[in-house]
């Protein structure tokens, strides 16, 4: 008998501190009007000093586990998608596993930048649907404020901190229908934080650098392709999509992708206005919001998609 993986709980967490566009006006040469016109972003959340990716992940995980109606001890796989880990090693997943009071089962990080949650969810699906895992915890958690050059108005206005999580369980009823992952390392310099450590010293800039126009054109192209790939694999049409939950990078990327796919705006979940770009956390944050406010309902087709530095990109098609 074929087995599938199904999302049975979602959770999220946003740091208390909110940084508005008006506050950014006093920090860097920008304006609320300029930011909103180009990105759609009104505000973003910023982690407190000493608040790490694992701390945000812990709160989101607790909410997802509670929503799933299980105990932390039932989790037998932890995957954390992050570009801003607590430390070089051990993995943030191992740190999170310990904070949850569990041990013994696999725990590891996935680093695919803003596609990280898509990569992590696809990986967990393979574990769960094959019987290698019963209940998987998948988390996207980021503290991008730590790698931000707050003097660079082209990047510092874009990003925020946060975490989102889901619990995936094995089921006879289809949940995740298919996943589709891609990468092209020839674009590795287009969007990066190119620092490295040699002999205890940081070489290169630890801050985000980005060629915005290249990112925009590439993102719209491959996000459309990733959704079409998922639809074709399941003999579905764009009209069959109940909800598109994209990576929340920029409102123009989101609306341009939806328009190319012929998906009306009212079927697109948008949180970038309030959260900014939270990288690997953006998709699970948006998913949790749409689940908790009742938009996502049983039996609906939900497409999750993301694109990030590398470039990496992908999609996951879910029957809720």
From Swiss-Prot:
HAMAP family assigned to the protein according to its UniProt record, in alphabetical order: FabH
PANTHER family membership: 3-OXOACYL-[ACYL-CARRIER-PROTEIN] SYNTHASE 3, BETA-KETOACYL-[ACYL-CARRIER-PROTEIN] SYNTHASE III
Quaternary state and interactors: Homodimer.
Entry EC no(s): 2.3.1.180
Gene Ontology molecular function: 3-oxoacyl-[acyl-carrier-protein] synthase activity; beta-ketoacyl-acyl-carrier-protein synthase III activity
Task of the protein: Catalyzes the condensation reaction of fatty acid synthesis by the addition to an acyl acceptor of two carbons from malonyl-ACP. Catalyzes the first condensation reaction which initiates fatty acid synthesis and may therefore play a role in governing the total rate of fatty acid production. Possesses both acetoacetyl-ACP synthase and acetyl transacylase activities. Its substrate specificity determines the biosynthesis of branched-chain and/or straight-chain of fatty acids.
Pfam families the UniProt entry points to: ACP_syn_III, ACP_syn_III_C
Pathway recorded for this protein: Lipid metabolism; fatty acid biosynthesis
Lineage: Bacteria, Pseudomonadati, Pseudomonadota, Betaproteobacteria, Nitrosomonadales
Protein's organism: Nitrosomonas eutropha (strain DSM 101675 / C91 / Nm57)
Predominant place of localization: cytoplasm
UniProt-listed Gene3D superfamilies: 3.40.47.10
Family the UniProt entry places it in: Belongs to the thiolase-like superfamily. FabH family.
Coiled coil spans: none
Residue numbers annotated as active site: 114, 247, 277
Protein name: Beta-ketoacyl-[acyl-carrier-protein] synthase III
Any one annotated GO CC term: cytoplasm
Domain comment quoted from the record: The last Arg residue of the ACP-binding site is essential for the weak association between ACP/AcpP and FabH.
SUPFAM superfamilies reported in the protein's UniProt record: Thiolase-like
Top-rank EC class of the record's enzyme: transferase
A GO biological-process term: fatty acid biosynthetic process
């Amino acid at each position: 008998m074929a087995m599938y993986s199904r999302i049975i709980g979602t959770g999220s967490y946003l740091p208390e501190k909110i940084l508005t566009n008006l506050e950014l006006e006093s920090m860097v040469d920008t304006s609320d009007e300029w930011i909103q016109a180009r990105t759609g972003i009104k505000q973003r959340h910023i982690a407190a000093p000493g608040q790490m990716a694992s701390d945000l992940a812990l709160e989101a995980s607790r909410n997802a586990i509670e929503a799933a109606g299980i105990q932390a001890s039932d989790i037998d796989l932890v995957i954390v998608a992050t570009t801003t880990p607590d430390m070089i090693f051990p993995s943030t997943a191992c740190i999170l596993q310990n904070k949850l009071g569990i041990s013994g089962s696999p725990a590891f990080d996935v680093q695919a930048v803003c596609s990280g949650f898509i990569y992590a969810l696809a990986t967990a699906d393979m574990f769960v649907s094959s019987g290698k895992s019963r209940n998987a915890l998948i988390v996207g958690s980021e503290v991008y404020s730590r790698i931000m050059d707050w003097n660079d108005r082209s990047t510092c206005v874009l990003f925020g901190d946060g975490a989102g999580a889901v619990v995936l369980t094995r089921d006879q009823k289809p949940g995740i229908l298919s996943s589709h992952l891609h990468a092209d390392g020839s674009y590795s310099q287009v969007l990066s934080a190119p620092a490295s450590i040699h002999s205890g010293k940081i070489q290169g800039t630890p801050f985000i650098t980005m060629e915005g126009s290249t990112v925009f054109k590439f993102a719209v192209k491959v996000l459309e392709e990733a959704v079409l790939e998922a639809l074709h694999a399941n003999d579905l049409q764009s009209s069959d999509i109940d909800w598109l939950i994209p990576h929340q990078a920029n409102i123009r990327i989101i609306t341009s992708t939806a328009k190319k796919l012929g998906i009306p705006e009212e079927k697109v979940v948008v949180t970038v206005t309030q959260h900014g770009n939270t990288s690997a956390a953006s998709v699970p944050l948006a998913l949790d919001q749409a689940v908790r406010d009742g938009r996502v309902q049983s039996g609906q087709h939900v497409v999750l998609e993301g694109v990030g530095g590398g470039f990496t990109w992908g999609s996951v098609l879910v029957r809720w």
